[in-house]
Amino acid sequence: MHCPFCSETDTKVIDSRLVADGAQVRRRRECLTCHDRFTTFETAELVMPRVIKQDGTREPFDEEKLRAGLQRALEKRPVSVEAIESSVQNVKHYLQALGEREVKSLMIGEKVMEELRSLDQVAYVRFASVYRSFQDLSEFQQEIDRLQKPKPSPIK
């Protein structure tokens, strides 16, 4: 950490405390060169990755776009607003946990399909038909057949 008074990099932490209900760390520091003291605050940086679209363009992650896609698929389906919000948070957490600066929109779409599969199968097929650009009834049937197969349990 650079000293704000003399710009030297040699500083030491004198005191650390949690503040803002544990969301921040307040540190008292002392410059080892000029001996002035200063305070810093640290917070976790939870930045959402940029999205690489299929045409190669990049755009910031848009939570509203994610929510709108889920709501469109779940329109007139018996799924609560809380369940939709939980799915939005699950997708965001998944993307943050990847730790990547950029993710392909394909990866987000697959995660949304995973969420929809557990929420509502009709909404899942609805979303899949648009997402995967179904051209005829046989593609719908293939997706329905896939849904009816038991999902393999993860290896422990």
Swiss-Prot record:
From the Swiss-Prot or TrEMBL record, give the protein name: Transcriptional repressor NrdR
Occurrences of domain ATP-cone (ranges) = 49-139
- Could you tell me the superkingdom of the organism this chain comes from? Bacteria
Q: Name one GO molecular function term.
A: zinc ion binding
Cofactor binding note:
Binds 1 zinc ion.
Q: Which GO terms describe its biological process?
A: negative regulation of DNA-templated transcription
Positions of unnamed zinc fingers: 3-34
What are the alphabetically sorted keywords of the record? ATP-binding, DNA-binding, Metal-binding, Nucleotide-binding, Repressor, Transcription, Transcription regulation, Zinc, Zinc-finger
The prosthetic group or cofactor this protein requires is:
Zn(2+)
Query: Pfam families this protein is in?
Result: ATP-cone, Zn_ribbon_NrdR
Family designation: Belongs to the NrdR family.
The function of this protein is: Negatively regulates transcription of bacterial ribonucleotide reductase nrd genes and operons by binding to NrdR-boxes.
Q: NCBIfam families from the xrefs?
A: transcriptional regulator NrdR (TIGR00244)
- Please give the InterPro entries that the UniProt record associates with this protein: ATP-cone_dom (IPR005144), NrdR-like_N (IPR055173), RNR_NrdR-like (IPR003796)
